[in-house]
C-alpha cells in the first residue's frame, strides 16, 4: 500500500475514533444532564420540606406561647371562684344589716376591697341590668311580667356573674321581663 492510502486509512480511522469519542461524550453529557435534573428536583423537594418544617415549628412555638399565656392568665380561676363566693356572703351580710351600722360599714369596706383586688387580676363583675339576655353571660332563673320593658330584658340580678380576662367565670343569675298575659291578648 502506498503512503497516501495509509494516510487516508489513518485519517479515516482517526475520524471514526473521534466520532466514537463524540458519541461517548454526548452520552456522558446526556447522563450528567439527567442526573443534574434529578438533583435539582430533589433540592426543590428538600427546600419545600424545610419551609414546611420551619412553618410547623413557628406554629408550635406560637401555640405554646398562647397556652403559657392562658395558663398564667387563668391560673387564679379556682381561687377567684372561692373569692367571689366570699363576695356573695359579704353582700348577704350587708343586706341583713342596717345602713350606718358600724358592722355594715366594715363589711362594705371589706367587700369593696375584695372587688377592687379581683379587678386588678382581670376579674370583673357582670352588670347586666337593663341589657338583653345573653345565654353566654347570663342564666335566666325566672320571668317577671313587666309591660314597660322589652321581653327578655334583665330586670333583676339574683346572683352577680363574673368574667376573668373576658372569659366567663360564673354566669349572672337573672330575672327577665315578659309581657303580661293581658298585653299579649290585645
From Swiss-Prot:
* GO CC annotation: cytoplasm
Name the segments for region: Disordered.
Answer: 1-35
| Cell location | Cytoplasm
Glycosyltransferase among the record's keywords? Answer: no
Name the Pfam families for this protein: GrpE (PF01025)
Gene3D superfamilies associated with the record: 3.90.20.20, Head domain of nucleotide exchange factor GrpE
Where is it chiefly localized? cytoplasm
The molecular function terms in GO held by this entry are: adenyl-nucleotide exchange factor activity; protein homodimerization activity; protein-folding chaperone binding; unfolded protein binding
Where does the sequence pass through the membrane?
Answer: none
Q: Which UniProt keywords apply?
A: Chaperone, Cytoplasm, Stress response
Chain intervals with Acidic residues compositional bias = 23-34
> What's the stated role of this polypeptide?
Participates actively in the response to hyperosmotic and heat shock by preventing the aggregation of stress-denatured proteins, in association with DnaK and GrpE. It is the nucleotide exchange factor for DnaK and may function as a thermosensor. Unfolded proteins bind initially to DnaJ; upon interaction with the DnaJ-bound protein, DnaK hydrolyzes its bound ATP, resulting in the formation of a stable complex. GrpE releases ADP from DnaK; ATP binding to DnaK triggers the release of the substrate protein, thus completing the reaction cycle.
PANTHER family linked to this entry: GRPE PROTEIN (PTHR21237), GRPE PROTEIN HOMOLOG, MITOCHONDRIAL (PTHR21237:SF23)
Similarity-based family: Belongs to the GrpE family.
Descriptive protein name: Protein GrpE
Q: What species was this sequence derived from?
A: Wolbachia pipientis subsp. Culex pipiens (strain wPip)
Please name the gene that encodes this protein. Answer: grpE
Amino acid at each position: 500500500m502506498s503512503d497516501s492510502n495509509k494516510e487516508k486509512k489513518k485519517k479515516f480511522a482517526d475520524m471514526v475514533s473521534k466520532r466514537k469519542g463524540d458519541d461517548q461524550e454526548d452520552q456522558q453529557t446526556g447522563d450528567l444532564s439527567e442526573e443534574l435534573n434529578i438533583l435539582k428536583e430533589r433540592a426543590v423537594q428538600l427546600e419545600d420540606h424545610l419551609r414546611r418544617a420551619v412553618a410547623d415549628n413557628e406554629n408550635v412555638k406560637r401555640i405554646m406561647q398562647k397556652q403559657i399565656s392562658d395558663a398564667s392568665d387563668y391560673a387564679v380561676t379556682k381561687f377567684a371562684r372561692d373569692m367571689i363566693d366570699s363576695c356573695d356572703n359579704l353582700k348577704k351580710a350587708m343586706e341583713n344589716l342596717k345602713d350606718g351600722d358600724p358592722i355594715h360599714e366594715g363589711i362594705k369596706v371589706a367587700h369593696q376591697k375584695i372587688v377592687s383586688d379581683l379587678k386588678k387580676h382581670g376579674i370583673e363583675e357582670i352588670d347586666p341590668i337593663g341589657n338583653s339576655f345573653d345565654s353566654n353571660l347570663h342564666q335566666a332563673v325566672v320571668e317577671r311580667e313587666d309591660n314597660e320593658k322589652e321581653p327578655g330584658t334583665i330586670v333583676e340580678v339574683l346572683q352577680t356573674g363574673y368574667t376573668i380576662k373576658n372569659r366567663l367565670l360564673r354566669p349572672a343569675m337573672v330575672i327577665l321581663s315578659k309581657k303580661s298575659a293581658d298585653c299579649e291578648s290585645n
